[in-house]
Amino acid sequence: LEDLMSLPFGSRWCMHEVLFDDSFLKDTGVSTLDFAKAMIDEGYHPMTMYFPLVVHGALLIEPTETESKEAIDQFIAVLAGLAKKAKQGDQAEWFKQAPRFTPRRRLDETAAARKPVLRWKPEEQSKDAAD
């Protein structure tokens, strides 16, 4: 993927994770969030976004050790396909519409953070527990 996506610390040996930044998306109109949301439509849970904070537009990928080489290769192919699509330069709107195939589309993350709607009901205590 190093020929399509940008590695902020160069191509060094890594153990179990890989970190990309968003410079490969420069001038495409596609944001880190847009790219991650498009992953959902491809059947993958998005990678960790915007962390670590010292990397602009960070995309942190940590596959589990139980994934087969074939599964990792397929994941890489999806990432490569999305990166190529973003670099076409005329696909920003396609990315901004993602995810398309989920029960809920894009949520208003700002409103959710500022005005959370949380539900929790304590379990009723039995009489024995009160004694």
Predicted feature descriptions by range:
Residues E2-D131:
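Non-catalytic terminal extensions of PLP-dependent enzymes
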